[in-house]
């Protein structure tokens, strides 16, 4: 009978062990390496940053443009158009008005025209003022945003202190009431307790 009872207990234990599933977790580094092999993009911020830089390198640079600055405010748009027309029709043009002067930007299909405009009008006097003409390389919008985010992140890191350091915490201020309570709650000496006990027994 004891043998049969042991067999019953053994069978029930075997059944419960077979029904109980043990979840085995793989190491985190192995799980992270499994994602790219299955076709999933890595979620690491550094990897995403590398992918973004790779895409920016693959994109062709924008065409160079000409910038004419320090133009007097009384110079009309028609005057500026007449100055540029002798070099051909620009495929892009934009004029900005500031408080002190004006700035215009032009883009031409032929990049060799830009050098000619610089030679012709850089330092040219227009309405008693010398204008400045230069060739510049425009940047894409996401490149400017990335540069702005990097500057912002750097400023935040400087505000937090040195790398690896903890945030500076302000010391906890204890009110005067709490200070008084702390003084009153100080442990009584052994002699004072004995004196109180003697007085209680005599009373």
From Swiss-Prot:
InterPro entries, per database record: FoP_C, Nucleotide-bd_a/b_plait_sf, RBD_domain_sf, RRM_dom, Yra2_RRM
Gene Ontology, cellular component aspect: nucleus
GO biological process: poly(A)+ mRNA export from nucleus
Record-linked Pfam families: FoP_duplication (PF13865), RRM_1 (PF00076)
Sample GO molecular function, one term: RNA binding
Subcellular location: Nucleus
Record's compositionally biased regions (Polar residues): 11-20
Composition bias type Basic residues, residue spans: 139-153, 161-180
Record keyword Nucleus present: yes
Residue ranges occupied by any RRM domain in the UniProt entry: 64-138
Self-association and partners: Associates with mRNPs. Interacts with YRA1.
Stated role: Involved in export of poly(A) mRNAs from the nucleus. Recruited to the coding sequences as well as poly-A sites of active genes.
Additional notes on this entry: Present with 1310 molecules/cell in log phase SD medium.
Similarity field: Belongs to the YRA1 family.
The protein, known as: RNA annealing protein YRA2
Source organism (scientific name): Saccharomyces cerevisiae (strain ATCC 204508 / S288c) (Baker's yeast)
């Amino acid at each position: 009978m004891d043998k049969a009872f042991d067999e019953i207990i053994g069978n029930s234990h075997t059944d419960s062990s077979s029904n109980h599933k043990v979840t085995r977790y793989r190491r985190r580094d192995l799980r992270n390496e499994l994602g790219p092999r299955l076709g999933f993009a890595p979620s690491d911020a550094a990897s995403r940053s590398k992918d973004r830089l790779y895409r920016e390198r693959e994109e062709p640079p924008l065409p160079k443009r000409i910038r004419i600055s320090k133009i007097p405010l009384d110079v009309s748009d028609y005057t500026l158009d007449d100055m540029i027309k002798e070099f051909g029709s620009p495929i892009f043009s934009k004029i900005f008005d500031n408080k002190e002067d004006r700035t215009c930007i032009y883009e031409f299909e032929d990049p060799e025209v830009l050098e000619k405009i610089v030679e012709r009008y850089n330092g040219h006097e227009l309405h008693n003022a010398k204008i400045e003409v230069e060739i510049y390389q425009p940047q894409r919008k996401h490149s400017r945003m990335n540069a702005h985010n990097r500057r912002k992140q750097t400023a935040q890191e400087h505000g937090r202190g040195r790398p690896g350091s903890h945030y500076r915490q302000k010391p906890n201020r204890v009110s005067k009431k709490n200070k008084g309570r702390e003084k009153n709650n100080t442990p009584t000496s052994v002699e004072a307790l004995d004196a109180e006990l003697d007085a209680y027994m005599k009373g």
